Amino acid sequence: MSLQLRSSARIPSGSISPFMRMAPLAFLLLFTLPQHLAEAAPSSVIAATELRCVCLTVTPKINPKLIANLEVIPAGPQCPTVEVIAKLKNQKEVCLDPEAPVIKKIIQKILGSDKKKAKRNALAVERTASVQ
């Protein structure tokens, strides 16, 4: 038994309006475009628009030598607590306890080293300006 399309089941192409021909394409674009926009958006933008805390669990201790970057997210409408996220040298992210004394020392040390770098850069700019 074979399935064959009857001639009465066919719709003549001249009787379909241009709108009806474009409807399936418009439908597909309508539902696939937002997905592509969401995938193309940077993760920081997505994280900023989510109204929830990033850190669900925190670590009270970490070796400072493992930290490549440190991000502090202040308390706000997305989360009532301050969040400290450390990006490690192995590309993992760890949430740190901002109230832990060890973490406070690490943050102060990083901020202190940033101030020292800024002073060195300012002195270097002054020296190059005085030489010219």
Swiss-Prot record:
<dbReference type="InterPro" id="IPR033899">
    <property type="entry name" value="CXC_Chemokine_domain"/>
</dbReference>
<comment type="function">
    <text>May participate in the recruitment of inflammatory cells by injured or infected tissue. GCP-2(1-78) and, more potent, GCP-2(9-78) attract neutrophils and are involved in neutrophil activation.</text>
</comment>
<keyword id="KW-0395">Inflammatory response</keyword>
<feature type="disulfide bond">
    <location>
        <begin position="55"/>
        <end position="95"/>
    </location>
</feature>
<dbReference type="GO" id="GO:0070951">
    <property type="term" value="P:regulation of neutrophil mediated killing of gram-negative bacterium"/>
</dbReference>
<dbReference type="GO" id="GO:0061844">
    <property type="term" value="P:antimicrobial humoral immune response mediated by antimicrobial peptide"/>
</dbReference>
<comment type="subunit">
    <text>Monomer. Homodimer.</text>
</comment>
<dbReference type="GO" id="GO:0005615">
    <property type="term" value="C:extracellular space"/>
</dbReference>
<dbReference type="GO" id="GO:0070098">
    <property type="term" value="P:chemokine-mediated signaling pathway"/>
</dbReference>
<protein>
    <recommendedName>
        <fullName>C-X-C motif chemokine 5</fullName>
    </recommendedName>
</protein>
<dbReference type="Pfam" id="PF00048">
    <property type="entry name" value="IL8"/>
</dbReference>
<dbReference type="InterPro" id="IPR039809">
    <property type="entry name" value="Chemokine_b/g/d"/>
</dbReference>
<keyword id="KW-0145">Chemotaxis</keyword>
<dbReference type="InterPro" id="IPR001811">
    <property type="entry name" value="Chemokine_IL8-like_dom"/>
</dbReference>
<dbReference type="GO" id="GO:0140367">
    <property type="term" value="P:antibacterial innate immune response"/>
</dbReference>
<dbReference type="GO" id="GO:0001776">
    <property type="term" value="P:leukocyte homeostasis"/>
</dbReference>
<feature type="signal peptide">
    <location>
        <begin position="1"/>
        <end position="40"/>
    </location>
</feature>
<dbReference type="GO" id="GO:0032496">
    <property type="term" value="P:response to lipopolysaccharide"/>
</dbReference>
<keyword id="KW-0732">Signal</keyword>
<dbReference type="InterPro" id="IPR001089">
    <property type="entry name" value="Chemokine_CXC"/>
</dbReference>
<dbReference type="GO" id="GO:0006954">
    <property type="term" value="P:inflammatory response"/>
</dbReference>
<feature type="disulfide bond">
    <location>
        <begin position="53"/>
        <end position="79"/>
    </location>
</feature>
<comment type="similarity">
    <text>Belongs to the intercrine alpha (chemokine CxC) family.</text>
</comment>
<keyword id="KW-1015">Disulfide bond</keyword>
<dbReference type="GO" id="GO:0008009">
    <property type="term" value="F:chemokine activity"/>
</dbReference>
<keyword id="KW-0964">Secreted</keyword>
<dbReference type="InterPro" id="IPR036048">
    <property type="entry name" value="Interleukin_8-like_sf"/>
</dbReference>
<dbReference type="InterPro" id="IPR018048">
    <property type="entry name" value="Chemokine_CXC_CS"/>
</dbReference>
<dbReference type="GO" id="GO:0042119">
    <property type="term" value="P:neutrophil activation"/>
</dbReference>
<dbReference type="GO" id="GO:0071222">
    <property type="term" value="P:cellular response to lipopolysaccharide"/>
</dbReference>
<dbReference type="GO" id="GO:0030593">
    <property type="term" value="P:neutrophil chemotaxis"/>
</dbReference>
<keyword id="KW-0202">Cytokine</keyword>
<dbReference type="GO" id="GO:0032642">
    <property type="term" value="P:regulation of chemokine production"/>
</dbReference>
